[in-house]
Amino acid sequence: SDNIIPICDDEYFDDDVTGRFVEFVRKVYGEDTLEENLKFVADALGGKGTPREVIRSYFLDDFYTDHLKTYQKRPIYWLFDSGKKNGFKALIYMHRYQRDLLARLRTDYVHEQQERYRTQLAQLGDAIDHASTSERVKLTKQQKKFQDQAAELQKYEEKVHHLADQNIEIDLDDGVKHNYELFADVLAKIK
């Protein structure tokens, strides 16, 4: 309803794209065949893991590339993307863009994600202190991932803040390319 759909590498938001997709399949095909239908989709996508993990991975890594191909590099969904570490990603529908969207994205999603990383890092710090040697290696690797994502997201938050303060209005008649460029610092690069 707020035109912001987070794409996460874990279940951080109730309304992330994977959760919404699962809910869509549940509503259309029913609860009884949900797992079977998710497995069908996951098998079609390919990849390793549970059906939900495969679907999550597709949205995180491949969906936007497919979307750009479909729309010949003039996307109607825009991917807000913090960078290679996947610190933060979210889709918005261009035709529903409103000038306060970046402020909402920043406060309702970016800040929320930053808080999740702080919580995860605190919990991992405690767990590492009390872990066995083999477990410590695994937890330290997770900690490094979260530290990298948090650092990436901190830099990204500053860029989003700068653009949010500008309260940018778009004119759909200017076209996707022009409007996308207004937000180039915070959107995925079109390749």
Where are these regions (language model features)?
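Terminal accessory regions of large proteins
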Residues: S1-K191
